[in-house]
A protein has these predicted regions:
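C-terminal beta-sandwich/jelly-roll accessory domains of carbohydrate-active enzymes
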Residues: 134, 145-175, 559-598
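Aromatic/acidic polysaccharide-binding cleft in carbohydrate-active enzymes
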Residues: 443-522, 527, 531-542
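Substrate-binding cleft and catalytic face of glycoside hydrolase catalytic domains
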Residues: 202-206, 237-406
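Beta-strand-rich recognition/accessory modules
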Residues: 61, 65-72, 83-87, 92-96, ...
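Acidic-aromatic substrate-binding/catalytic surfaces of carbohydrate-active enzymes
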Residues: 35-94, 101, 220
């Protein structure tokens, strides 16, 4: 149940300005730069006090109360612009013709100032609201009081005080997802700070699935910037799995051509060659490589490209079923050429996100048919490449894999189950993916790993500690719940880069690793060929994943602390372990190492 508190801040105005200040009672001990969590789409997700997140989520909303409403949120706006300058984070975004410019600035110890400018055409009959959402988990018993320019929310372990720059009238509503406030405010936040020990328990008696290690995507798009990022990542991370692009439309652009003959006669497209060389480099490092296709040639598209329009990044090409044999031969020719001329045998093949259509679209049954038919075609050529079941755009579209999952005739051609982690990774959904892989006795892969598919549009967010924390939280949860064979970062190139500087997304200074890089380096430092170890935490704010290679006596326990600073007490460590190395990554430390005797 969600309670909403709304304050009308704008109606038919050309320009409107209002201010917000967050006061934290002088008990803040974290660096100010880590105090306020601001998402790239403008939402504030709370303020940290001694590491404890005093949670509330702000949003901007435009529309009709109890009616049609547009709300700021992840991937809900068209290219919001995020920027940080010192202690100030700003976002510019537009909702229904109203342009909002929000600045969030840490002003002093425990003091955060928020200012919002709104620009609107006076002909628009729209009402805009500034909302604060309060979760049922921490505010189910909350008491809300308003008086003039002040609103207070008090629960058993939270207290929020909002001070406005003018008198306001609050409207309270009950909804199903949280609690929200629309304001021109100055909030004062405090709460119970939990420094108690986190008790971490390993279950060494029930080891789970193999974790090959962390992987990466290497779809080449930027010849100027990709090489330096790829080199840095491959030289400084243990990368255990790779995924590259099959540039199909460049491999055989003409229907009646012989692509192998063209290539052998010196006509191989440069981008095709670069993709093959990328795969060869990864194979030379000893890792399996997945081949995925985004863009089909025009001749293979049902109705031709002109009959399709790209909307929101999705074009959803249907392949021409009348040309199925030519399509299968064209793709198989690439696999044969890669083997004969580059020594590459691809482990698995997929059409990228064919549940959604980026860019080839399949129905669930077509996906099952493709796995069975193309899998048999490759087997007939003695090629070892298997199919990925799924390679879905999100965890949410699980049902897409059901026809193939329920058809035993497809199983011998499936090398792994795969989904992308952009959306929908709640515990229940993640468990469904893990169970699907177990049902047909194949590994689970996260074919594209990260949290926000639209983040390239506001790339400065990649350098934010909050983004880094959300990402590593997700990976740790996936490792614990799904026990995947690998998570393949999107990407280990300049696209969604783990590095900053030297012109990456226009950034200045030398090329350097971000906090995201160090988070992922810690996870990638898991011992090779380790098994997932079931692990539990006594604190819900501490996410854990554990791995062990019992043969070599090597173990790793990964802990992500979303709460206040606390001690971790680990039980279940094998008796033969006498010393632990502890690595810490945060806004200040980059895999800082200390040794702890057991």
């Amino acid at each position: 149940m969600t309670t909403f508190y709304r304050f009308d801040i704008m109606k038919n105005l050309r320009i409107f300005q209002f201010g917000i200040v967050v006061l934290l009672c002088g008990i803040l001990s974290l660096p100010l730069s880590a105090q306020t969590e601001v998402m790239a789409w403008s939402n504030i997700t709370g303020v940290r006090v001694d590491g404890e997140l005093i949670d509330f989520e702000s949003s901007l909303r435009v529309g009709t109360l109890k009616g049609d409403m547009e709300i700021t949120g992840k991937e809900k706006q068209v290219r919001p612009v995020f920027h940080r300058e010192g202690d100030m984070q700003e976002v510019t975004t537009t909702l229904r013709g109203i342009k909002f410019h929000q600045k969030v600035t840490d002003k002093g110890k425990g003091l955060v100032e928020i200012s919002i400018d709104a620009l609107s055409d006076t002909t628009l009959n729209q009402t805009a609201y500034y909302c604060i959402a309060l979760s049922p988990e921490n505010y189910v018993d909350a008491k809300v009081r308003t008086s003039g320019r002040k609103l207070t929310v008090t629960s058993a372990n939270r207290k929020l005080e909002f001070k406005f720059n003018k008198s306001v009238k609050a409207t309270v509503e009950k909804e199903s997802t949280g609690t929200v406030v629309y304001i021109s405010l100055m909030p004062h936040a405090s709460g119970v700070i939990d420094h108690s020990d986190a008790e971490i328990t390993l279950d060494m008696q029930n080891p789970g699935s193999l974790f090959a290690g962390f992987g990466g995507n290497f779809r080449l798009q930027n010849p100027a910037a990709d090489p330096k990022v790829i080199d840095y990542c491959l030289e400084n991370l243990r990368v255990a799995y790779g995924r590259v692009e099959f540039p199909w439309r460049l491999w055989q652009p003409e229907e009646e051509s012989d692509p192998i003959a063209v290539a052998q006669n010196g006509g191989l497209n440069k981008r095709v060659e670069e993709s093959l060389l990328m795969a060869k480099r990864l194979k030379a490092m000893g890792m399996p490589v997945i081949l995925s296709c985004w863009f089909p040639p025009a001749w293979a598209i049902d109705g031709g490209p002109a009959s399709y329009a790209r909307q929101g990044g999705v074009i959803a090409y249907r392949l021409d079923s009348r040309k199925k044999e030519k399509i299968y031969k064209s793709m198989a020719d690439y696999l044969l050429y890669a083997k004969q001329h580059y020594g590459i045998e691809f482990s698995m093949f997929s059409f990228n996100e064919s549940d959604l259509g980026i860019d080839v679209l399949h129905t669930p049954q077509e996906h099952a048919d493709f796995i069975q038919e193309f899998g048999a075609y490759l087997a007939g050529l003695n090629l070892p490449t298997r199919m990925l079941l799924g390679d879905n755009s999100d965890a949410t579209t699980f049902d897409f894999i059901l026809p193939a999952l329920n058809n035993p005739e497809t199983h011998k051609y499936i090398g792994a189950v795969s989904f992308h982690s952009w959306r929908g990774c709640d515990d229940v959904t993640l468990k469904k993916w893990a169970d699907a892989a177990k049902a047909i006795n194949v590994p689970l892969l996260v074919g594209e790993g990260s949290t926000d598919a639209a983040a390239h549009g506001y790339a400065e967010i990649f350098n934010e500690s909050t983004f880094a924390l959300y990402e590593i939280n997700l990976y740790t949860r996936i490792c614990a719940i799904c026990q995947p064979l690998s998570i393949l970062q999107w990407q280990l190139t300049s696209d969604y880069s783990l590095l900053w500087g030297d012109g990456i997304y226009g950034s200045k200074g030398p090329l350097r690793p971000t906090q995201r890089f160090w988070n992922i380096k810690q996870l990638a430092s898991t011992p090779a060929d380790a098994l997932a170890i079931p692990v539990s935490s006594s604190k819900k704010n501490v996410n854990c994943a554990a791995f062990g290679n019992m043969v070599r006596g090597e173990y790793a326990v990964h802990m992500v602390n979303n709460g206040a600073e606390c001690e971790a007490v680990i039980s279940g460590i094998p008796a033969e372990v006498k010393e632990l190395k502890v690595y810490v990554t945060n806004t200040k430390d980059c895999m800082k190492e200390t040794a702890v005797k057991v």
